[in-house]
């Protein structure tokens, strides 16, 4: 094996990067890149760069570096190595190139709290600063399904309509996630890119709206279905739940969460998962009360 590691000042081969990510996901059961990173790869986002490891003509490892919109000189980094090239120093070589090319603060995600990730972070002086938990629950055959959906007075739920609801959703999303480092900075372009993905289904993108003004979005539950692969069945996801701050305390968040879970159960999914920050005690209490249990953790390391 002769692996070459090369830094690039752009994303010159998006299709190969997405294919590499899929190989890693199939082997690990978890995606190595976030949805936002995949959006940035496919769109060729300005400022996004990468380090690529190749064995001949084959892409066998890569790190993607994306500048954060709301933090000057801070970069999100995600790295993966093809299953057949692991434990051979490829990740260390990629990280060495990253250290030389990134001038600023690095926030590197390790999808799965693995010993190899911890060793690599320690080697390059990164400190764990954030735990993102994955929770799961069974819905197929569960006695509590369908969950009770108790909406505040004057509110109803309808599906998202492409071409109608983008701006209203962006408004409530930015308000609901004003303090969230990823979700709150989604742009119209990011949303439209997701609308073009094969997994996007507006029927599972639930909006809570005013009965008097159905274009006024008060909250939402965006669900997602991960297709099955091999022996692994399809998996539902509570992709994002948000409520306008004016509606907090009304029970709308719980009602939307329950409605989305019911939708996924009706679609025939056996399990539903979600991500939540470990220090978000209010959200943890809600999800645990709805039957979710801890399953997996992603760790952010910072320089």
Swiss-Prot record:
Keyword Acyltransferase on entry: yes
The UniProt record lists the keyword Lipid metabolism: no
Top-tier EC class: transferase
GO molecular function: mycothiol synthase activity
Gene3D superfamilies listed in its UniProt record: 3.40.630.30
Binding-site residues, acetyl-CoA 1: 79-81
Biological role stated in the UniProt entry: Catalyzes the transfer of acetyl from acetyl-CoA to desacetylmycothiol (Cys-GlcN-Ins) to form mycothiol.
Protein name, as recorded: Mycothiol acetyltransferase
Record organism: Kocuria rhizophila (strain ATCC 9341 / DSM 348 / NBRC 103217 / DC2201)
